[in-house]
Design a protein with these regions (language model features):
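Conserved residues at the C-terminal ends of beta-strands
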Residues: 43, 48, 116, 168, ...
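Active-site catalytic loop in hydrolytic enzyme cores
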Residues: 91-160, 174-180, 184, 188-191, ...
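Short, acidic/polar
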Residues: 20-29, 148-155
């Protein structure tokens, strides 16, 4: 059996407190690495929090990798795991994007995905590229939060050979909250989806009830919500594309 151990970092990120969030990510990644995980997934915009622009603006956003991401890459190399990191970025022509960076076990930046459906992010441009990331022979499509709202992005990943979907998100219940979209994407594509959500309350949205999930064939196999940061670990059978774990192993931070 080819077993994949995955850690979802269900984090209490604080909008606009970059240093706090970076320290939280580093702490959580180190703890997750102690569980011998293969992948670590953070929520959408884990570095900045969701509604950061209302507090600190956007002038601080850098081209990547910046100094912190280079230091973080060194950490990733030292713990020998793969990381999906949600972080704003500035392109070399000055556009801003809501991006997930994929770092390999060697600490190398091997892929990026810019959020396609950025209409609700008033500070960011919409990405255009939809290419699965190859992680050790496994092709992974990245659905950033509302990119799961319609079938466009997920179907594109499927057509390009994706075998697993991951969903770094900041999406809680309430007005315009998730309403079966994640489940439907797994039905549309036949692919499993691992959703890494978050907790906390931002300027105008709340995530206390937001759920991190493992979904297959339209069914929620695992779910977690909490009022504090937590590392959620589970095992996945890559050969049969089936869940091994009966529940998340939860470690609170």
């Amino acid at each position: 059996m080819r077993r994949l151990k995955i850690a979802l970092l269900h984090l209490l990120s604080i909008a606009g407190d970059i240093k706090y969030n970076q320290n939280l990510i580093e702490e959580a990644v180190k703890l997750a690495a102690g569980k011998n995980v293969d992948w670590i997934i953070t929520p959408e915009l884990a570095v900045s929090g969701l509604q950061f622009s209302q507090k600190i603006g956007v002038d601080w956003i850098n081209e990547q990798p910046d100094e912190w991401l280079r230091t973080f890459s060194t950490l990733v190399r030292s713990i020998n795991t793969n990381v999906f990191l949600g972080c704003p970025e500035k392109s070399d022509t000055g556009e801003l994007y809501n991006t997930v960076f994929v770092l390999s076990r060697k600490g190398e930046l091997i892929g990026t995905q810019r959020k396609i459906s950025s209409i609700t992010d008033n500070w960011s441009n919409s990405g255009t590229d939809m290419v699965p990331v190859d992680l050790g022979g496994i092709k992974v499509g990245i659905l950033i939060c509302a990119d799961a709202f319609t079938n466009k992005v997920a179907d594109t990943f499927l057509s390009k050979g994706a075998e697993i979907l991951v969903g770094p998100s900041s999406w809680g219940p309430g007005l315009h909250g998730p309403n079966g979209e994640w489940e439907q994407r797994t039905i549309d594509t036949g692919l499993p989806l691992f959703v890494c959500n978050r907790t906390v309350e931002d300027e105008s949205v709340t995530f206390w009830e937001a759920e991190s999930l493992v979904i297959k064939n339209g069914k929620r196999l695992l779910s977690h919500k909490s009022v504090h940061s937590a590392i959620l670990t589970f095992d996945w059978d890559l050969e049969n594309m089936e869940l091994i774990s009966s529940d998340f192993e939860v470690q609170c931070l």
